[in-house]
Amino acid sequence: MSLKYALYPGCAAKGATPELYQSTMAIIGRLGIEVVELQAASCCGAGVISEADPEVALALNARTFAQAEQAGLDVMTICGTCQGVMGAANKRLKDPETRERINRMLAPEGIVYGGAVQVKHLLWIVVREVGLHRVREQIRVPLSDFRIAPFYGCYILRPSWDLGFDDPENPTSLEKIIRAVGGESVAYAGRTKCCGFPIILEKEAIAVAMAGQNMKEAKEEGADFMVTPCPLCHMSLDIYQDRAGQAVRTPLNLPILHLPQLLGLAMGIPAKELGLSRHLVSVDSIVRTVEKRRDSELRTKNL
């Protein structure tokens, strides 16, 4: 059975982190997910536009939702920040008066949003709609050699009344996926904290210290690498990792994977197809371990 969604990749996956888009497209077919990409979608606003003009932010997202609604599909996001912003906007657009007001703004484009669309992150879809049993069926190289730190960030968890999927204080969805791919999930205090990205342009020293503290805690608990469902978290943790390590006076060297890269590695998809060479913090040691295990299992099967 195929699950079909309107794919909203967001800006980061088509710009600064194309490996997120690449790895998403590499895994979804194996999970029975079919997508129609929203080619004319707007930026979600990332919480910035709503600060300047909440009505414009709602209109931008209603415009995107209307495209999915016209196709008869729910929206699939692959960015935790997009999920948080769009989930909040969609909840407000369920109110008929709000929706009518925003539709008047969209009228010159001939666009009307009826409020029927749901917005779902890939993480939620995999856990709840694909099912962990199907994930386990697709595993070719169990990641049993690794202790993996989940990092949720803010927007995919809070505010819970706009999102409503995972417990904002004690989420479990990433941990379930880590176990499904054969890894050991690392428990640490920073997994639900902010990555620092929202303030990185204004207060870089504070932002990198926040990121550094989260990674330091994960390393202290024995994490081999970290996985996140948000590309903005990924940028904060990967691109700024050297400065983050300096801020907390700890050499980190902690690889950061996108969620679909984690799934793809365990499915036996080659590293090149997952865009793993794009990371600033090298993931080569992880790839070598996975490839060695994959080759060993292939030799065993051929005996």
Regions found by a protein language model. Name each.
Residues 1-303:
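Iron-sulfur cluster-binding electron-transfer modules in prokaryotic oxidoreductases
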